[in-house]
A protein has these predicted regions:
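Low-complexity, acidic/Ser/Thr- and charged residue-rich accessory regions of DNA metabolism proteins
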Residues: 288-330
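Long, charge-rich intrinsically disordered scaffolds of nucleic-acid metabolism proteins
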Residues: 79, 84-204
Length: 330
């Protein structure tokens, strides 16, 4: 285990970073760019912080942290990202919120666990491009849906045909978006196939009933090919399908519920995967039918999502494709 003398917590936003050394109650606010990183290096020098013996802890932000991570890798600084929910749940009762306070709490979280921390793997450029392509594909799909709604509403309200100028323009936009989406999907598959391990894992998880290409792409991207989360449960917390207790003493007796702090796009795509699994997987269908007798459908759907995550991580770990061998008891 490498001896780290300093653990820094970093709260990253789109334009700024807040860095804190909780043990010494030192903090820095800087821009999330090269100039800000230079300011960070000077701050470390002024406070005798040896970056070669420094460990940086930060949260997943969906991409805002990548520029800072690239800086860390260029300077050979060890770092690790954690789901925001995991850090939040470790804090206990917290009053108030600011970027500076968040950086302090992240640093505390790292200091408490420093003996068990392992650095993250270096960023994979193919994974970064994959995430960028998926984000742009999502934008194109949403735009397409908007244009489709425009056509539908205009035809309904004004009883016009395809020769109407607005409908014709919207149709052209839809056709262009379809072409661009196809190009992006082709590039996504090209990226995945260019990496033998990535392509094999993609084939493994899409062999599961319910996990189609889009869920496969997103899972590969956001787990960074199953390297950025230690196990299925940590990923499930990140996605937001793990329910947490909501009770205290005799006055608060809430049911377990999932947190609003989640990667909502992944969760949304898994919703569709869970519905398909219930329809087409005999095992999942039997589970849903059994539980529907006394459980709410939303709870069952959430449980199926967790089962799919467990199945993906288990199969990837074993390096095996899914084989349907369920036999319903007579």
């Amino acid at each position: 285990m490498k001896p780290w003398n300093v653990v820094l917590g970093v709260d990253v936003s789109k334009k700024t970073i807040d860095i804190c050394w909780a043990e010494q109650k030192l903090s820095l606010h800087a821009d999330n760019n090269s100039e800000g990183f230079g300011k960070f290096k000077k701050w470390c020098k002024d406070h005798s912080i040896d970056l070669s013996k420094t460990f940086i802890v930060l949260e997943y932000t969906g991409g805002y942290e990548y520029r800072f991570i690239q800086f860390c890798e260029s300077q050979h600084i060890d770092y690790r990202r954690f789901p925001g929910l995991e850090i939040k749940n470790s804090r206990g009762m917290v009053r108030g919120k600011s970027d500076k306070a968040d950086a302090f709490r992240i640093s505390q979280y790292g200091e408490e666990r420093v003996k068990r921390l392992e650095p993250s793997n270096p960023l994979n450029k193919d994974i970064l491009e994959l995430k960028t392509l998926l984000a742009f594909r999502k934008r194109l799909v949403r735009e397409r849906a908007g244009y489709q709604n425009t056509v539908k509403e205009r035809k309904h309200m004004y009883e016009v045909g395809d020769q109407d100028m607005i409908i014709a323009m919207a149709g052209a936009k839809i056709a262009a978006n379809d072409e661009y989406t196809g190009d992006i999907e082709a590039r996504i598959m090209e990226l995945i196939k260019s990496d033998e391990k990535m392509y094999f894992n993609y084939q493994v998880i899409t062999s599961i009933k319910g996990i189609g290409p889009i869920n496969g792409w997103m899972t590969i991207a956001y787990t960074e090919n199953f390297t950025s989360f230690p196990d299925a449960r940590h990923y499930a917390v990140y996605v937001g399908v793990i329910p947490f207790d909501h009770r205290s003493g005799t006055s608060i007796k809430g049911r377990k519920r999932t947190s609003y702090l989640a990667q909502k796009e992944l969760k949304q795509e898994l919703n569709q995967a869970a519905r398909i699994a219930i329809l087409h997987s005999p095992e999942m269908r039997a589970y849903a039918e059994r539980k529907l007798k006394n459980k709410d459908y939303k709870l069952i759907l959430n449980n199926v999502k967790f089962k799919l995550i467990l199945r993906m991580f288990s199969l990837v770990k074993r390096g095996e494709k899914y084989v349907e061998n369920y036999r319903r008891a007579a």
